[in-house]
Every structure is written in C-alpha cells, then in structure tokens.
Regions:
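Acidic/polar low-complexity segments and flexible, solvent-exposed patches
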Residues: 1-83
Length: 83
C-alpha cells in the first residue's frame, strides 16, 4: 500500500490504564472519530484523527485541547486508506 505523510493528534502518552481511559473519554466526546492506541516502550500512546494538512489538524486540536490539554500535532507516515 502507498504511504503518505499525515498530521495526527496525540492526546495521551503514559500507562495502559491511562491510555484506555483517554480512549474511552475521547470516544464519548467525539464519536465516529478515528482513534488508535500504540505501544512505544515504555509508553502507550493514544492518537486520533488523520489530516492532510497541519491547518486542518490545528482546527481540531483547538477542540480536543478543551478536554485533553496535553494534546499536540505530529507528522506520521500512514497508509493512504486511513485518510
């Protein structure tokens, strides 16, 4: 599959329980939004959405930061079917 650079928002990094709690809270606040958890030793990371441009990501980041103050945007290579 083809990969592209996308802009993602990370809402949590820490313990497995904390990641699960963040995922559940986010799902209730923003249903039908892409949400994934990954493990990068020693942290579980909860990531949401996938945007083509940083500007698109910034618009959503403002909303997400109300409930997830440590949320931030980062670039990631993803498969094109996630966009």
């Amino acid at each position: 599959m083809k990969t592209v650079t996308a802009f993602r928002i990370q809402i949590y990094s820490g313990s497995r329980n904390g990641s699960t709690n963040a995922k559940n809270k986010f799902s209730k606040l923003f249903p039908n939004t892409l949400i994934e958890t990954s493990y990068e030793q020693p942290y579980f990371k909860t990531k949401v959405s996938a945007f083509r441009t940083r500007l698109e990501a910034q618009k959503s980041l403002r909303l997400y930061k109300v409930s997830f103050r440590s949320a931030f945007i980062y670039e990631e290579k993803i498969t094109i079917d996630k966009l």
